[in-house]
Amino acid sequence: MGQKGCPVGFRTAVTKKWRSLWYGNNQEFGKFLIEDVRIREFLKKKPSCQGAAGFVVKRMSGKIEVTIHTARPGLVIGKKGAEVESLKAELKKLTGKDVWVEIAEVKRPELNAQLVADGIAKQIERRVSFRRAMKKALQSVMDAGALGVKVQVSGRLAGAEIARSEWYKNGRVPLHTLRADIDYATASAETTYGIIGIKVWINLGEKKAVPAANHAGAASTAAA
């Protein structure tokens, strides 16, 4: 019987890189993992990081490097770099360590599952029809060159008394093919009748396996 699994975790260290790059012994591992989660939760709540597609955390000799992948780098950097400096100061206060912040621009936001999911969530919160938001997202993703896309929403859709799920799919989205580069993300829309969950799968084509050097020590590295 087939089981549901996360496409990203399923392919981590095979065709996808880890989102946390560090080594921790038995005493440090739990501490580092909790710290990573706190860093990510903190950044997700910052207005300047609302257009962020993801965060990568690296550790080296007592320092932390956080790479913010975003479609709006100017918003994260701020006027004359003021926002980045503010983030550094707040992260240092949160972790007690020196934190370096790098900004990486997402060149094609239409092909990023997290940005697509967030976009659908924002439309639903603005009372746009969930079907219209889903179909518009599918069209923009396919127009951008994806081989396939699937979007699913769950909850009290359109204020219905009974929660249900609806999904739309266009193209090919293989879930068991490891070499398939599947970008997957989730988001939630807070509405007056409850929370609507959104899931997005995007097939970006086939991808070669990640070189062993890129995931050495993967067993001791957390992908939070």
Swiss-Prot record:
One CC-aspect GO term: cytosolic small ribosomal subunit
One MF annotation (Gene Ontology) recorded for this entry? rRNA binding
Q: Name the Gene Ontology biological process terms.
A: translation
Taking every annotated instance into account, which residue ranges of this chain make up the domain KH type-2? 39-107
Instruction: Report the PROSITE patterns cross-referenced here.
Output: KH_TYPE_2, RIBOSOMAL_S3
Q: Specify whether Amino-acid biosynthesis is a keyword of the entry.
A: no
Assigned keywords, A-Z: Ribonucleoprotein, Ribosomal protein, RNA-binding, rRNA-binding
Q: Where is the signal peptide, in residue numbers? A: none
Q: Does the keyword rRNA-binding apply?
A: yes
**How is this protein organized at the quaternary level?**
Part of the 30S ribosomal subunit. Forms a tight complex with proteins S10 and S14.
What role is this protein assigned? Binds the lower part of the 30S subunit head. Binds mRNA in the 70S ribosome, positioning it for translation.
State the family named in the UniProt similarity comment for this chain.
Belongs to the universal ribosomal protein uS3 family.
| Record protein name field | Small ribosomal subunit protein uS3
